[in-house]
Amino acid sequence: MRKELHCPQIIKDGKTIGYGGDQEWFPGDFQRLAGCGSVTGSNIAAIYALSREDFKDLYPIKDSQKAADYEQYLNLMQTMYRYMKPGFMGYPLIGRFAKDFKRYAKDHGITLSSEQLFLPQSREQALDFILPALKEDHPVAFLILRHPAHELREDNWHWVTITGFDEEEEKLIWSHCGECEEIDWNMLFDTDKKYYVGIVKFKEEE
């Protein structure tokens, strides 16, 4: 089975410049350096808003046809940054991410609950946490604190947005700095290596 949620393809001057947002679009130096958490929050908000009528207020724009417009998306990112403002060490806390995103949602009339998984002990534990959420149309926030894989050498201390999966290929699909990437989950959750990751997912509060 392969499934991919609708992550906005961001358009600027008639050209596609991003699969979701990119922290390099922020105007401030520190925002560009440490704004990945708020980009992931923005991606999750936009995916929810564009796929569910009852969640549309998470991306409050008057014309949904302009949801992929660069200026509109940057405005969402700037708003989310005020909720997820990083400290001098960045924003490396899954509990804080969950709390801040739920606060953003609450301020927009939507009550969410969250679950967090830190340092999954096996590939199976990680996938049992991630895949059911995606199958139920919930994007997943993923924090890479430290990972020894060569493929992830540029991605330590970084948030990405998981938007899909391919069970046959054994890959996760995510938005990373505005790029759509497919990542081998056997590499990502290789228990022979010491890695530090955290995962956050949301759902409607019952």
Task: Specify the residue positions occupied by each region the protein language model found.
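Structural recognition of the beta-strand scaffold that forms the well-ordered cores
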Residues: 113-114, 140-143, 173
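Internal catalytic-core helix/loop-beta-alpha segment
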Residues: 103-136
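Short, basic/glycine-rich phosphate-binding loops at helix/coil junctions
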Residues: 74-82, 99-112
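Extracellular structured ligand-interaction cores
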Residues: 33, 139, 159
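Active-site signature of cysteine proteases
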Residues: 123-129, 133-136, 145-206
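Short, amphipathic alpha-helical segments
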Residues: 35, 91-95, 120-124, 136, ...
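Active-site-adjacent structural segments surrounding the nucleophilic cysteine of cysteine proteases
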Residues: 1-94
